Structures are given as C-alpha cells and as structure tokens.
Amino acid sequence: MKPSIYSLTRNDLIAWTIEHGEKKFRATQIWDWLYRKRVQSFEEMTNLSKDFIALLNENFLVNPLKQRIVQESADGTVKYLFELPDGMLIETVLMRQHYGLSVCVTTQVGCNIGCTFCASGLIKKQRDLNNGEITAQIMLVQKYFDERGQGERISHVVVMGIGEPFDNYDNVLKFLRTINDDNGLAIGARHITVSTSGLAHKIRDFANEGVQVNLAVSLHAPNNELRSSIMRINRSFPLEKLFAAIEYYIETTNRRVTFEYIMLNGVNDSPENAQELADLTKKIRKLSYVNLIPYNPVTEHDQYSRSPKERVDAFYDVLKKNGVNCVVRQEHGTDIDAACGQLRSNTMKRDREKATAGTAQ
C-alpha cells in the first residue's frame, strides 16, 4: 500500500524531491498545492511536469481516507466516520465554537488504555495511525468547508479522539509540526491541544520538544484508589509519578496544563472528591485549569451515569472556593453518537450483524 504524501514533513518532502532529481523549489510547490490550495490529486498540480506527476502517483496517495458516515448535530457539530486503506474505521469530530472551527482527531485504531467509562476502548488498539492518516482527517474536514466557498477555516485542533496520543508519540509530533507549519495550514500552536491519559515519561519528553502547543491531562479522579479503579493506566503511572512529570512540564515550558475531569454520578463527583482535587492541584494552581465534563452515557458501560446538575454545581463551587480555575465544558453533539468512539463502535456492531445475517441466509 502506497503511503499518503501527507506523511512527509516539509523537510522530508524536500529530501525526497532532491533525491529524485528535482530542485528544492519543487517541494515548495507541492507543499503549497497540498496545504494552501488543498488539491486532492497530483494531476491538479498544474505547474509540475507530467513525468513528475507520474512519479508522485507511483510513490504516494494524496488522501488515504474514505468517508463512510457523516452525522450532523442540531448545534452544528459534525461527526465523521472515515475508513482507512486497510478497512479500519476511525472517527473525527468538528465542533463550532464561539472562537472558530475546532477539529478533534484520532491517533490510533482502538485504544489500550482501558478507561472503564469510555467508548474508545470498547475495541482494543489494532494499530497506530501514521502522521499522514492523522493529517488527512484535517484535510478532509477542511475540504468540506472549501467546497462550500464561504472562506471558513479550521482554526483549532484537539488531539483527543480515539487512542492515546503519547502512545503514538513520533507520528503525533510530526502531525503537530505539519499543521503548525507557517507555509501550510498555519494553525497556531496555541490553538492546538494534545490530551494524554497520563504517560508520565512522555509528558517529560514532550516538555523538551520545544513545541508551544497546549497539554491536557485526562485526570478523572483525585486519588490513586479511585483513579486506578476507573483508569487502568494509573496502576503504571500513579498520581505521584504523574504530577512529578506535570510539574517538570510546567517548570520547563512555563505553560498551563488543563485537567479533564469527567463527572460520573456517585463515583467521583462528591464535594469530598472536589476538595481532594483542589488539594491535589494546589502546588501548580497558577498554571493549571480544570475542565469538568458532563458524561455521555455508553450502552456497554451502563454502570455509569451522568452527574445531575446540582452535583456538578456543588463540585464546581468547592473548586472555586479553593481558588481553582475551572469551567464546566460546553456540550456538543448530544443528539448524535456523542461519546468518543461511539459512532465507530456502533457502526462496527451493525456491520457484524449484517454479516451474520448474510451468512445465516
């Protein structure tokens, strides 16, 4: 299977072009066609020779994704189900925010982190996405807006879809540098957020990369016992190790860390839990922020339900009284398969049922 040309960084593309007997400026032309003009075939690159276009076609695909399903919410949220060249399925979500268009990308096919409340882990990790497959998600969503002709552009990216980004570290890093490139999509680093479930050693590595993107940590519990019971990763990276890495990140980058905290009724949403969370984050309060997330129920995890508004409000009040910077996240796409991984999981279930029915006939 040929790789997507999106899998090449700009430096990779320059090296490949020179290696194949062309001048460096040809790489600049290709990059411009891909990310500024956003063409979907090499034939549209009209300032390249036919022989060079043939060489590109021989070695690369442009966009490796095929659109399977699109769900649009009443609030303007759009959820895409894309099929990869090997038939695997991934999700991408577009959210309309007051500050612009934000896209949430997937980094792995399935997830091995094992959070007990999450739809993403219903199907175990089958492989990493390469950086071209991650970039292609942005390009296909942007293509939709280009075709509408209203001049709308993706302004923000969150790496919070299916999978653990830091478990696919190198590909995610290449993706970040591609979409941030001033000569391409030029999405500002401070408009990009990467979320991790808590791979402490990778947080330290990320601190040393010099990228100015935002970091979010999926915390979801304020003590080791509770966090280990709902997030298996805490057994490998308990809170002491995780927070040591977070403190290192803040000291190294002087950048704020956001904590994601999903509100599970009767599990992690008591005033006592809120006080524990305030105490846990006290040392880094000036450069941390807590995002309280309403839970989107998942059929396969029916032991969990959404915290009622009064419990969320009480939790929020405790945090605010302790001086914690926090917000209750605005919901998106509640009338479609809203939970991360849910559309993919439901589609795969329907595909299996159809296959079984066909075999029975």
Swiss-Prot record:
GO terms for molecular function: 4 iron, 4 sulfur cluster binding; metal ion binding; rRNA (adenine(2503)-C2-)-methyltransferase activity; rRNA binding; tRNA (adenine(37)-C2)-methyltransferase activity; tRNA binding. Disulfide bonds join 104-340. Gene3D superfamilies: 1.10.150.530, Aldolase class I (3.20.20.70). The active site is at 91 (proton acceptor), 340 (s-methylcysteine intermediate). Its EC number is 2.1.1.192. It catalyses: adenosine(2503) in 23S rRNA + 2 reduced [2Fe-2S]-[ferredoxin] + 2 S-adenosyl-L-methionine = 2-methyladenosine(2503) in 23S rRNA + 5'-deoxyadenosine + L-methionine + 2 oxidized [2Fe-2S]-[ferredoxin] + S-adenosyl-L-homocysteine; adenosine(37) in tRNA + 2 reduced [2Fe-2S]-[ferredoxin] + 2 S-adenosyl-L-methionine = 2-methyladenosine(37) in tRNA + 5'-deoxyadenosine + L-methionine + 2 oxidized [2Fe-2S]-[ferredoxin] + S-adenosyl-L-homocysteine. SUPFAM superfamilies: Radical SAM enzymes (SSF102114). Its cofactor is [4Fe-4S] cluster. S-adenosyl-L-methionine binds at residues 163-164, 195, 218-220, 296. GO terms for biological process: rRNA base methylation; tRNA methylation. Pfam families: Radical_SAM (PF04055), RlmN_N (PF21016). It is found in: Cytoplasm. One of its GO terms (cellular component) is cytoplasm. Residues 97-335 form the Radical SAM core domain. Its main location: cytoplasm. The keyword Signal does not apply. It comes from the Bacteria. Keywords: 4Fe-4S, Cytoplasm, Disulfide bond, Iron, Iron-sulfur, Metal-binding, Methyltransferase, rRNA processing, S-adenosyl-L-methionine, Transferase, tRNA processing. Binds 1 [4Fe-4S] cluster. The cluster is coordinated with 3 cysteines and an exchangeable S-adenosyl-L-methionine. Belongs to the radical SAM superfamily. RlmN family. PANTHER family: 23S RRNA METHYLTRANSFERASE, RADICAL SAM CORE DOMAIN-CONTAINING PROTEIN. Reaction proceeds by a ping-pong mechanism involving intermediate methylation of a conserved cysteine residue. HAMAP family: RNA_methyltr_RlmN. This is Probable dual-specificity RNA methyltransferase RlmN. The gene is rlmN.
